[in-house]
Amino acid sequence: VIFNLPDYHVIDAVDLPLGGRRVIVQADTVADGCPDCGVVSARVHAWCRQRVKDIPHAGSVEVIVVKPRLVCAEGACSRRTFTQATAELPVRARCTSRLRRGLLEAVIDHGRPVAAVAASFGVAWWTAQKTVNSAIDTLPDTNALHVTQLGVDEHRYRKVRWYRDPDTGGWSRVEPWMTTIVNTRCGQVLGVVDGRDSAAVEGWLTARSQAWRDRVTVVAIDPSAAFKKAVTGCLPNAKIAVDPFHLVQLGNQCVTRVRQRLAHEVHQRRGRKVDPAWAHRMLLLRGYDTLSPRGRARLEQVLAADDPTGELGAAWGVKEALRLILASHTIEEARAAKTRFDAWVVAADTDETDRFAATITAWWPAIEVTIATGVTNARTEAANTAIKHIKRTGRGYRNSDHYQARILLRSAHRARQHRLTSQGTTANCE
């Protein structure tokens, strides 16, 4: 039988009457060190047999390990006898190390559900889950990683829950959010904390060493006052960069609000399919430079047919002026584009565009940092997409510790693979 269990050899193998095979193995060497004093002994006190779990091998396999119980060679040692332990079968192990490696590879590397992996390997769910949980200890300490750029973003942990107060009888809505902290240079998730307020992020940052915090130079966030407060309070040397995606999203929301308001003012109802502005509402949100000549002609037709006040076109122009700011390559270009943006806002003269312009002005220092450094939350958003895939694979999680373990291990594996395939580049997490 070719069993290939490292440091072990097969001494017997029989086919079982009901199918499968029983394989009896023994270690290549008898000698082992005492777990208390470390003195190596080869004197056998007795032999014992232990049934252990191993990876499937040409069908169902029942593995029996013949272990020697050794006598400690040190007379002053308090332990008289001990059982042999190896790298594949540590002390009190009931599964081989290669089985645990196989479980971890299937769950983390290939993203399979723990329940499905446990069933395919013939072990209990808790055995597979404990293997995943124990792998967290093998991850490098965050304080030991050389991190200079961070990305912070939130994601919803699970569906909205309603809880009833036993004293008042009132119901309260709870949205379970988690905040993801990512190394934006390589996309590795460094931490996942409960909540999306400043206290959650501050708690994680203050747990890092002062030297680690002093090395961080740029932090990319969405336009969140809570994240901004946490970063400015805990990272004194870091500049804040606001993510361009979220700024464009705010611009699109501004256009949508103007369109909805005009629909009520002009038609005294919500938009319908017969209204060109509603029928082509997604066209209004597209970047003008991404449109084909046919799309640009259709956009002009929509604004000419369903924008009697000109406010919708003005709001669209403000949104496009913002995109020109974000497309700038230098601070001088950005400031010149900001001047044109302000002119568009004055010409639009609507409440929606004024509020939008106030937001851009408030976050202008962070916008300049984004343009100067090029740091965005793109890899943070990519990490959140991978996190959502993990959540869907597990059909949701009731235990947040298990959820965070899957996220950190999966992200560390992807970052390690990225380093192996990107040698010589700047994509390095260490």
Mark where each language-model region is.
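N-terminal cysteine/histidine-rich coordination modules
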Residues: 3-29
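Short, flexible, mixed-charge glycine/proline-rich loop motifs
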Residues: 21-31, 60-67
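Acidic/histidine-rich catalytic cores and adjacent linkers
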Residues: 36, 42, 171-175, 183-188, ...
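Short, positively charged, Gly/Tyr-enriched micro-motifs
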Residues: 38-41, 46-150, 154-161, 213-214, ...
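RNase H-like nuclease fold core
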Residues: 42, 127, 131-218, 225-230
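A structural signal for short, well-ordered beta-strand segments and their strand-loop junctions
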Residues: 117, 151, 220, 240-243
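Short secondary-structure boundary/capping segments
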Residues: 135, 166-167, 233-239, 255-259
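Short alpha-helix plus adjacent loop in nuclease-associated cores
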Residues: 244-268
